[in-house]
Structures are given as C-alpha cells and as structure tokens.
Amino acid sequence: MLPLDSSDRATLSPEQQFEQDIALVMQNAIARHHDGAFDDAKALYEAILDAIPAHAEANYNLAVLLVDAGRATESIPYFETALGANPGNGQCWVGYINALYRANQMPAAWVAVEMAQQRGVHGPALDGLISQMATPTVTFPTAPAASQDGPDITGSISLNISSQPQPQPQPQVDKGTNGDAPAKPVRKAPLNKLQKHAGLFDKKRSAEALSLARQLVADYPGDGASLRALAVSLYRDRQYAEMIDIAYRALESLPGDLLLRTLLADTLRLMTRLQEAEIQCRAIIATQPTNMEAHRVLGIALHGLRRQQEAVAACRRAVELAPHAASANGALGFVLLDQGAAQEAAPWLRRAIEIDPNDCVSHSSLLFSLIHDDTNSPEMLLKEHRAFGKWHERHALPKKYANSRDPERPLRIGFVSGDLLNHAVAHYLLPVVEYLSRDPNLSLHFYYNYVIEDHITAKLRAHAATWQTVTMLGDAALAEQIRNDRIDILIDLSGHTGRNRLVTLARKPAPLQASWIGYPGTTGMSTIDYYLSDSIVTPAGELDDQFVEKIVRMPALAPYAPPVNCPPVNGLPALHNGYVTYGSFNRLNKLREDVIALWAAVLRAKPDSKMVIGAIEQDRDRDTIAGWFAAEGIDPARLTFQPRATIPVYLQQHHRVDICLDTFPYAGSTTTLNALWMGVPTVTLAGMSIPTRGSASWLKRVDLGAFIAHDKDEFVRKAIALADDLDTLQTVRSGLRERCLASAPFHPDVVAQGLSVALRMMWRRWCAGEAPVSFDAVPPDQSTSALAEQTAG
C-alpha cells in the first residue's frame, strides 16, 4: 500500500485517517517480522496496541513473535485478547494452546483444547499439539499392524518355487558407463549348479540350498537365475528383508518371471509394504488374470490398506479361480472375519481346513470367528477348540525332560508371541516383565514370531536373558530349540490370534505350558496345562468347564500402565452441552448391525442424545455405520465420527463423551480401561463366557457394577437411567482415576508378584509329580494381598 498524499488525506475523516495509519503500521510490522527484524516488529505491534489494545491481528502477531522468541508466558495475554475479538479463529486457538504448553501451564492448555474443539477447531495441527502435550518426551512411530487382536494370514505361498526360469536366448549385457566402451557380459551360472540348488530346495535341505544360492550370487553377480535361486531360498527361510532386495534385483533380469514376482508380492505383504505388494500383484494379474495367488495376496494387502470391499472382491476371485485351494478359502474367511462378518467368514474358514486339516492359520481363524458369534453355546465352542487340540497334538513329543526337578531352583521362563511390539499384549506384558526381570529366581526368554520391531520391542528385549526371532523356524525346529534351551515353563501370549505358535506348543517342548493375555478362552490343547486369569473374569468353579486348561487366578488378569502424561480428566460434557453424549472406541470389526441396533435403541429412548464413534479409518466405515443407524431411525446428524489417531489424541477424544456403550458378544477390554482412566464408564452386556466379560471385569474392579447389564433390555434401561443422573456421572468421572489407582490392575508389581507365585506353585507341583489343578496365586506380601482382595470384592 502506498502512503496517501496530503490531498488524499484531506478527504478522509479523522477516524478514517486513523485506520489508514494503523493499517500502514501493521503492514510495516508484518514486513519487519517476515524479514527477521523482530525487535522492530515488536515495537510496531506494541505501538498499534497502545492505540487499539483489542486489535486482534496485532495481538496475535505479537503473541506469535513472543513464542518464537522463547517468551511463551508473556504471549498468553495477547493470544487471549485476540481470541476475545475473534473466538472462531482456529489458527489463534492452536497458537494459544501451544503457548500454554510451552509455558508449562498444562491444566489451562487442556481446558483450551476442549474449548477450541467446542468451537469446531479440529485437524492435524491441533492433533499434533495434543500428542506433544501428552507425550513431551521422544515420540516413537507406531508399529504397522493389519489387525490388533485377530488372526492374520502369515502363511507362505504354496507353489513349486524351485522351478527354474527359462534360459534367456541371448546373454544379458550391462549398459556400460564409459562412453561407447563395450559393456562387460554378465557371467551366467552353469545349469548344473542351478539344478543342484533346485534339488536341495525340493528335498527341503533348506540350509544347504541357501548356502549354495549365496555362493552362486557371489560367483555370478548380476546373473538373474542365481539371484532368483537366492530369493526363493530366502523366502523359504523367512529372511524377508533381504529377500525383497534380492528379488527386485532378480526381476531386473527376469521381468517375466511371474512366480518370483508373486513371491515378492507376498513378502512385501508380510513386511507390511502393502502399496508395493499391490503394485506387484496387479502387474501379475495384468499378464496372467487367472493367477490365484496374485488375487489372494492382493486381497490380503488391500485388507491391510483398509480397502475392504476391494479386498473381499479379490479374495472371492481367488476362490473362483481355485475353489479347492485352502489358502484361497482361508484368505476370504480371514478378510470377512476382520471386517466383523464372523458368521459369513466361518464357512470359508471351515472349508479351508476341510481341504487341508493342517492349515492351522485358518483353523485358529475359525475358532476366533466362533467366539465372535453369540449364537454359539459354550459347549459348542469347547468342542470346536478341542478338535483343534486333538488334531495338532498328534505330533506331541515324548514327555521326558532333562529339566532338574528341584522345586526351589531358579526357573527359565519362556514367552512365545508375535505381538512383542506396539500392541495391546505387549503393553500388558511390559510392566510385568520389568518387575520379573529383577527377580534372581527367574530368567526370561523370548521367542518372537514376527519380522517387525519397534520401540516396545526394544524395551522388552532389554529385560530378556535371551531373545530369538523365530519366524524362520518351523514348528518342529522351534520345539527342539525350546527343549534345548531347557525352558521350564513356556507361556503362550497369543491363543488363537494372529502369528500364534500353538502347533509348536502342541509338541510340548517345555514341562509346563500356560496361555495368557492374548485370547479370551481355551486353546483346546491338553498340552497347555494352565490358563492365567483372575477371580473376577473366571470365578472359582464358574467357567472351569469351558476350559481344557486348569485356571490360575492371579490378583488381576493383567496390569494396566496408563500412558505417561496423558490428557487429564475433564468435566462431564453433558453439564455444558445440555445433552448426553454416548461413545464407542472399540475396533470396528466388533461393530455389527445387531450391535448398532442395540445402541440405536438407547438413542431412540434418549432423543436429545448424541454419539461419538471412534477408530474410523476411512469414509466407507463411516458411511456403513451411519447407514446401519439410519436403518434404525437414527439421524446421522446425531453421530460424530472420530478418525483413528495416536494414543494421546485418541484419549483426548474421550473429553467429548459422557458414557461409553460396549460391543457384544466380544466386549471391550483395553478400550474400556482407557475410557475408565479418562473418567468415562462403559455400559456393557456381560454373558457367560470370557469374551463377553472383558469390560465387566474392569468395571467390577472400580466398583461400577451398576454399569453391567445381563440382557439387552437391561442394557438400554441402564444406559438411559445413568444418563438421567448427571450428578452421579460427574461424581464418578471426577473420582475414576482414584478408583483405578486403588485397584490391582493398576499396580503392575501386584500382578507380577501374583504371576511369580503362580509359576513357582506350578513348578512345585510338577517336581512332585502332581497333575495341574486350578488354584489362586496370592502374593506373600500381606499389603498386596489385601489390595487384591479389596479390589476383587
């Protein structure tokens, strides 16, 4: 803007001249600010504020300048003045919250977050601030995971991968890099050496085949056939990271080798490089549309990318192409199951194990689907689980062990899991391991059945006497390794969920074996002696007939360690909203039409209420759920969908919710604990099996039995009655953290002591030649014992 000359100024009123002068000063201040002349800019902003103290832009810009200068506390009044003039300015809210955070005024910062959200401020900038506020230390990336709780497909491609590529009609030639100098011909491996590799591979002499393939690549670098031999050997040996690099190199020479490309696609999928897997699958299908494996791997990759309709279509196409392939049927069943269609998934999974009774992945997925179906009786579930055990225990090893039968000696405890990363199982396990690793009478040995590691993996590994990644070991080899390691008690942390090694445990490699945390039910295996639980989830004598294992009742099923510096509990939203907000943060595959129908009954009975649904991953999820509500007469305008988010942002989303509504028959567990920690109780529908009791067990721990219903009508009545009593809800909300901290699950040392007692009692019985029995594992310390009794009552 150019300065006005005297004639122009003469035509302006004094007020207009004043406004023009202020605008010119502001323009100059902003220019000086952008040029880095901060002292000059500050002086100009202050001059404006001397004239107009409520000038919104000057207040905001000066506040930003002060924050950038490390003077956050001084900036706060200027942000507040700017917001007073323009309370809908999202950028100003973010700056204000950031200033409060940097000034270490955390309670005020959290209040400001809530106020901003009430004014419609959302988005990445605010979410990023919430994450910083809740986690002021180093933030680590989350581990990729396709499914947090359910089975996944980790089986390899069932193909004759030793078949050799066709000889090339002409030798491959490097392009050369020195002008027009002739390129150096690539030396090709002799056919007899490639055939020798194929013979070793076909005879499953995998170590020799891999060694020979490495030598071939060393002797004939750049030879596509040698690289291919190494790639397929690495695939079988499950050395996936190296396999990917070698396969890409091989395909430069052998671009038409669809078999190798299929193996590469599957390996990329296993390493969660899903976009690359999709690219490879589509390249195969473009050349060979009837390639069943390409469609199958594509379906699983698309599922991991949360493109569910495409995933189902790809898996259905795989079944059409190969209706008698167990892998195709199993993949379709898995994808349907992980979308929450348990009843639709079960026939496909059952078909897979009819085709191949040794398909343990599909068999575990079938059992996982059955516990999600509330039409299945406990007797039927036990029978189905026993069938798994009976079949896979055919290879059980003779029960002779070299372990010393000294009842008081230090014990070697093994943990087997594919979830030793940023996963609910690992979060339960870590605080227990931190305690047990300090016990001189125990040494901890981990067998990790996954290829992905993260910061949680590193924390667990730090407490391990030994740590082995066992993805490359077959069940017989892993069982032999565990026996050679002289493990005294082996603990399965998966049950019938993804990446389990139950078939290894079916061989009984350790004298005593137990299952814990990963699965809410029996494994069905007689080779697993104990199921670790507590007296609330599995009261003495109440659910024993649903288990093959004997039940050990610890002070708590597992500990809960709240995230450090997570958001505080806020006031009850209904008190300022004027209406009640229900909520759900359960994983989406627990949400089905009958679950939505029950929630809709609550919303119909409480017509002014609203609902927040979290963990939304894509627009299609939102549209599907909104459609189910609409079919029940609920206006989608009453629904708010929150995206899947980082832990701090997810926890802060509870600030908008008064009461959570639970899923059924597979109730919440970690989600319920997180909600309790954020002051939000959950109305749950408890039944007569562990999957239905997850939330109920935690609610009983904090004396909130009033939120537990036993049929659908009672669920609706309780959800309405509790919403009508806002004073009680506010009292519960404000005191929930104190209740939590008074209960055993929030004391990892108590749970760890209970586990330590349980392990020693199991061992003493084995040393005495006594059969496993159900028992209570009570820590010897009377104070912790009293805490356990208090919280169980």
State the predicted function of each range.
Residues 671-672, 695:
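Short glycine/serine-rich donor-binding loops of glycosyltransferases
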Residues 447-452, 610-623:
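Glycosyltransferase donor-sugar binding loop
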Residues 661, 675:
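Donor-sugar nucleotide-binding helix/loop cap in glycosyltransferases
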Residues 583-594:
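Substrate-binding clefts and catalytic carboxylate motifs of secreted carbohydrate-active enzymes
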Residues 1-579, 597, 627-634, 646-659, ...:
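Alpha-helical solenoid repeat scaffolds of the TPR/TPR-like class and their adjacent stem/linker regions
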Residues 692-703:
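Short acidic/histidine- and often glycine-rich active-site loop of Leloir-type glycosyltransferases
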